[in-house]
Design a protein with these regions (language model features):
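Glycine/tyrosine- and acidic-biased, solvent-exposed loop/turn segments at the edges of beta-strands
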Residues: 1-82
Length: 82
């Protein structure tokens, strides 16, 4: 389920929720894909925050474990850690 905020033609800020109503993603879309800064959540808990390009993690980012502890901080390229 998606809740679009100020999105025109797939561009703008968005919040996505899972079927249980828990936040799954919040950030910006460009041409219907994640672009710019955003945050991913798993079971309502922050799992990743960082930059996206064409729907993939790209640029600086941080991954967190289920307890909220920083697990990785670094660069991504085309969805892969560098």
């Amino acid at each position: 389920m998606r809740l679009w905020n100020s999105v025109i033609n797939g561009n703008g800020k968005v919040k996505e929720y899972d079927y249980k109503g828990k936040l799954r993603f919040e950030g910006e879309y460009l041409n219907g894909k994640m672009n710019g800064k955003g945050k991913e959540y798993k079971d309502g808990k922050l799992e990743f925050e960082g930059e996206y390009l064409n729907g993939l993690r790209n640029g600086k980012g941080k991954e967190y474990d289920y307890d909220g502890k920083l697990r990785f901080e670094g660069e991504y390229l085309n969805g892969e850690k560098l």
